[in-house]
């Protein structure tokens, strides 16, 4: 791949561009050069769209607390600089940030949907792209915060908050050392695997799940698709998690096909003996498939994640 290109975004006019979207627009279609868009501290209030074929883009901030991409679209009310025929409608089109370009990286960025509680589906970011990685990022919202729609994604040291189905979609995702915060009652995940032949699913590895101080109000997940697959391994769960753990989305047939697994989790919310009978604890040999990076980086002769982790470009580069 060609030499990395650096551009800087600053809302005060001191950078190469004043808006994140202007910087993205400068990247050519079919891009093969890693383009690092360095975001100066600030709250960037506009919807952001990374189109298909604008690949190898990095968003880099100094700290997620002071570098925020935010907008307030909901599934029922979308204001965007792109037409609905481009970004979609409803939940699919309402993301504050929409990423469709492959090999995307974000570091030290907050992705927020600022629509208030009770607004319905309000996505902070939708990722419809392969080989994407997020490091030390925050994802803020209420319902449907993080839409991991399609492709393979890796999240490390991230903070994700919400209430209803706030990590959802049908990608293959590994979330490692992440903090999952449950703001009010609902469901953490809604994974939508449609067939047992699909390799998709969400793995939470060495994560921490916290709540708002109340007990027993949050489910670990429910199957948006009949074969929804979620694995929690070596993860701390506080008392916000309901003892039963999982929900069938009002359809008993889902209990025959959903794949909801736990492995060596701990904390007051990890009541494995009281879980619904159609979820289960993995055996050691079964867990091996899920607790390694190969879950999202399966091709040993064409690895992407190990290379990605070695070529991260810090903000100061």
Swiss-Prot record:
Reaction equation(s) it catalyzes: [(1->4)-alpha-D-galacturonosyl methyl ester](n) + n H2O = [(1->4)-alpha-D-galacturonosyl](n) + n methanol + n H(+)
Species name: Arabidopsis thaliana
Pathway given in the UniProt record: Glycan metabolism; pectin degradation; 2-dehydro-3-deoxy-D-gluconate from pectin: step 1/5
Top enzyme class: hydrolase
Record: residues binding substrate: 91, 121, 222, 224
GO MF: pectinesterase activity
One GO-annotated biological process of the protein: pectin metabolic process
InterPro entries per record: Pectin_lyas_fold, Pectin_lyase_fold/virulence, Pectinesterase_Asp_AS, Pectinesterase_cat
Activity as a function of temperature: Fully active at 0 or 30 degrees Celsius, inactive at 55 degrees Celsius.
Residues flagged as site, Transition state stabilizer: 143
PROSITE patterns, per the entry: PECTINESTERASE_2 (PS00503)
pH dependence: Optimum pH is 8.0-8.5.
Annotated control of activity: Does not require salt for activity. Not inhibited by kiwi pectin methylesterase inhibitor (PMEI).
Active site positions: 144 (proton donor), 165 (nucleophile)
Name by which UniProt lists this protein: Pectinesterase 31
Function of the molecule: Acts in the modification of cell walls via demethylesterification of cell wall pectin. Acts in a blockwise manner, resulting in a cell wall rigidification.
Similarity remark: Belongs to the pectinesterase family.
EC number: 3.1.1.11
Superkingdom of the organism of origin: Eukaryota
UniProt KW keywords: Aspartyl esterase, Hydrolase
Note in the entry: This is the only member of the pectinesterase family that do not contain a transmembrane or a signal peptide.
Tissue-specific expression: Expressed in siliques.
